[in-house]
């Protein structure tokens, strides 16, 4: 999940939310995307990636490909409650907040700040978006002049950011609600005595877990359902194109609570209750976005390391 802009209003809203986490898709979703992608790497690229990751001594995650897809969240949050150096330097990189009522992609990407002369992408401006970072890290992974350490970082960031880009609420914002973090909801078996969760968390984790709790099994099932035609179509386009897809899914599906009834949580707040009708619209989007994320991550890596 993401913690957005420095606006005092947004900070106050997000900090006050219960169940706040610092991940996108949750570990489960990122591992599903990565597992699909790994199965679609060419043998040559798979060997190169295995070699890059084998030299990685970082202990924030397990060393395998799918676990490394969660690394960028772990790194960002490793000093979130202390010095906040890593957190403040990288937290904006996980999303592109396109306002649903007045979409402005360039504004959501902080007007695309260039990398300062002599700076690598992992040391780039803190005010930048996930689309720019995917493009920068892809260029570094492709370049033979990139140092081994920076190439390893580029790979780990790409494993995560391509997944982030496909979570619809990482591509949209509704009047500074931090991509749905400030939208309180109840769902499932949550009764009046429950605490509210938030819409962003619901898309990060709760909907993904409805697909199954064995991430590899879910990934294998989704991967097996991807037709060659879909894989070919999904592999085209640019990160900006993919961001606009996520924006559309957020605007038309994730944020559409118009048909939901309300319930009162234990704190006396009246909030939308997401029922089976909402899930029946949302779950196909979750399946498709996870599948697209896996196909596109593989396409990015296969092209950069061919």
Descriptions of predicted regions:
Residues 10-11, 156:
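Residue-level detector of transmembrane insertion/anchoring sites
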